[in-house]
């Protein structure tokens, strides 16, 4: 008689992690299971903390809206959305920082590629750890004026920028290749119909500037679209 015993390791994560230090609201979080640390964005700053809320390091100097994020265990990299824009949200961030407001024509949107291994102290300048990939497709839709039912409207598709970020396989295939997905923010406005879709851009991991797919998911009117998203391997 052969008896085989196996043990399952259960990790108990805290129900609450109390974290302070940002001037604005927390927007995105990502968990590093191997290092037992949490990455979080406080809109204009990025924090690295342990699971008890003790801050290990931070990244500052961001005059923009650092939003949702995802963590790639293989490359030790956080990918986050970054908006630099002129709307109510953009003005609020600049005002809170005492910084100059952005002009509409200068509004830009980026995927921030963050090397978390370099965050080893407080107030690391963002230029030392972040590589920014400009997403022209989002900027174009944000700046465009369209005619809907004979009325000229700002922001094509109701695009307010971008927020949700996730790493996942391609839709409809069994390939193991991973892609980075970024979701548009969508202004809520029930008087128009071109904003009844949530929009996802799909990027190859080695080319975060040029989307390979642009998906339109009809959901009806939403307020700011997809704020956060993740991939469920079990579904």
Question: Which sequence ranges carry the predicted segments?
Answer:
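Beta-propeller blade signature
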Residues: 93-121, 193-208
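Blade-loop segments of beta-propeller domains
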Residues: 52-99
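Repeated scaffold domains used in trafficking and secretory/extracellular systems
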Residues: 23-30, 63-72, 137-145, 157-170, ...
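Hydrophobic, aromatic-enriched interface-forming segments
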Residues: 151-217
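Beta-propeller domains
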Residues: 32-62, 207-208
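Residue-level detector of Asp-centered blade-edge/turn motifs that repeat once per structural unit
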Residues: 31-35, 71-75, 169-176, 231-234
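Beta-strand-rich domains and repeat architectures in extracellular enzymes and scaffolds
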Residues: 14-44, 163, 169-172
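Surface-exposed loop and turn segments in beta-propeller and other repeat-based domains
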Residues: 14-19, 117-162, 204-224
